[in-house]
Amino acid sequence: MLATGTLVVVADGSSALIYRNSGHETISLDLVQTITPHSLLNDGPAGAAPVEQSPHDRDEATFSKQLVHKLNAMALSHHLPDAVVIIADPTSLGHMRPLYHAELKRRIVRELHKTMVKSSARDLAAALSKP
């Protein structure tokens, strides 16, 4: 069960959705924000790009980096609740994890390694209800 007020960040390499759990006895997710590469500042590529990395892969790594920078800034300015769930595909999580600030890490109560950015709030709630 997720605590009321938990923020749920659902991401892939090209977009992210932020939900807040408004449920008390069951999970009820309300969409708070949609994030796209165009809605984030351009921080540039996520470190040195391997020669074999395609422009698409580089864009996905950059978006993941920008998303974590936004979440870190929210955590440091106390604009994140004490409980955050991250749902992202394994590749995006691989880009994101090393960039988590300690203040964001402290708030992350769960991670799901799934591609669910196009899933309904009901499907997300069902996935979060499983142990």
Language-model segments: residues:
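Terminal alpha-helical anchor/extension segments at protein ends
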Residues: 1-131
